[in-house]
């Protein structure tokens, strides 16, 4: 389960109290809690002050017993901010890390090298919509298959964005795509 607040802006870090309650509830169901680490909506280019806030949020959530984090950071050129990400990954060590949909802002031509970096630096999974909100479903499905190949069993690809009960099986039919993400996906 990914836990976040403010879905209207793409998700932000939930409060300490919400994280604590979710971790307690999840234990009853043997469910994992992955907490969004994002100090605000908008772009994914963070100041040093925002990175400090993100590090403090990771520390607090870790102390509450979460299983991992969903996070991301980009440069103003929409490339991975590897310096910021290394800092966040170090703070997240030994827990699962999902690169969230900030990835979708990276130009398609640069995505293979970004995936390589994520694999080399211990990221667990990549959450992506495999296109824009306007991208046709067939094109997204094709792109997911390409991303699964690029991940080469070293990074889980997590399909997200517009997935619902009505279409989830089309995504899960892609070889190597075993997870879907959404607010309207119920099994």
What are these regions (language model features)?
Residues 1-11, 60-78, 121-136, 163-164, ...:
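Glycine-rich phosphate-binding active-site loops on the catalytic face of alpha/beta enzymes
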Residues 7-34, 48-52, 73-93, 106-113, ...:
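Active-site-adjacent beta->alpha loops and helix N-cap segments on the catalytic face
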Residues 22, 61, 88, 100, ...:
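Conserved, mostly hydrophobic/aromatic
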Residues 31, 66, 95, 123, ...:
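Short glycine/serine/threonine/alanine-rich loop segments
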Residues 32-33, 37-44:
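Glycine-rich nucleotide/cofactor/substrate-binding loop typically near the N-terminus or early
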Residues 35-37, 71, 99, 159:
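Structural beta-sheet core signal
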Residues 38-40, 74, 102:
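Beta-hairpin (beta-strand-turn-beta-strand) motif
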Residues 42-60, 97, 104-121, 142-159, ...:
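Catalytic cores of alpha/beta
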């Amino acid at each position: 389960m990914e836990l976040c607040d403010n879905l209207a802006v793409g998700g932000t870090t939930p409060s300490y109290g919400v994280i604590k309650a979710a971790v307690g509830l999840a234990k009853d169901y043997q469910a994992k809690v992955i907490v969004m680490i994002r100090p605000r909506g908008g772009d994914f280019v963070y100041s040093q002050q925002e990175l400090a806030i993100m590090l403090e949020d990771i520390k607090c959530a870790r102390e509450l017993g979460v299983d991992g984090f969903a996070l991301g950071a980009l440069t103003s050129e929409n490339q991975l901010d590897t310096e910021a990400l290394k800092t966040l990954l170090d703070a997240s060590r030994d827990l699962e890390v999902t690169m969230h949909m900030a990835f979708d802002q990276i130009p398609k031509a640069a995505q293979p090298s970004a995936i390589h970096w994520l694999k080399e630096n211990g990221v667990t999974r990549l959450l992506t919509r495999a296109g824009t909100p306007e991208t046709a479903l067939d094109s997204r499905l094709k792109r997911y298959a390409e991303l699964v190949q690029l991940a080469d069993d070293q990074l889980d690809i997590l399909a997200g964005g517009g997935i619902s009960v009505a279409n989830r099986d089309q995504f899960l039919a892609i070889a190597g795509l075993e997870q879907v993400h959404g607010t309207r996906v119920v099994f």
